[in-house]
Amino acid sequence: MATSKCYYPRPSHRFFTTDQHVTATSDFELDEWDLFNTGSDSSSSFSFSDLTITSGRTGTNRQIHGGSDSGKAASSLPVNVPDWSKILGDESRRQRKISNEEEVDGDEILCGEGTRRVPPHELLANRRMASFSVHEGAGRTLKGRDLSRVRNTIFKIRGIED
């Protein structure tokens, strides 16, 4: 069955014109400038002739650039971010050095000449194989003799004999 290229159905109703006309579109719609410029002075002079509209090849990427930047204010206050390396001083350096010497991060593996970064998916795959090494095959559980062997082995390791 062939489909037409028109995605919008044709309207089955008609609108008849009336004598009432809207004189100004600004009565019902907000202008973009009203939303973006709420924090600045209303007395700042701006004319729409200062705007330049550039379009890309496809015509969908339209950008509007303002002509003057004099009336713009900062939208957020500056924040003081503490520098913890200066606050803690030598203690943070000492702690970092101790932690680097004692253990390797979870995503690094020791090699002959140093450490090697391991991608996270390989690291998870290695951990999963270690945790599911009792199971053989996808979706298979231990039953009967296999389960009793595993249970008896665990009891022997723990020191509890059945």
Curated annotation (Swiss-Prot):
The lineage of its organism: Eukaryota, Viridiplantae, Streptophyta, Embryophyta, Tracheophyta. One of its GO terms (cellular component) is cytoplasm. This is Protein S40-4. Keywords: Cytoplasm. It is found in: Cytoplasm. Induction: Induced by dark, abscisic acid (ABA) and salicylic acid (SA), and slightly by jasmonic acid (MeJA). Triggered by pathogen attack such as Pseudomonas syringae pv. Tomato DC3000. GO terms for biological process: leaf senescence; response to abscisic acid; response to absence of light; response to bacterium; response to jasmonic acid; response to salicylic acid. The keyword Transmembrane does not apply. The keyword Cytoplasm applies. Belongs to the senescence regulator S40 family. The gene is S40-4. InterPro entries: Senescence_reg_S40. It comes from Arabidopsis thaliana (Mouse-ear cress). PANTHER family: EMB|CAB72159.1 (PTHR46525), PROTEIN S40-4 (PTHR46525:SF7).
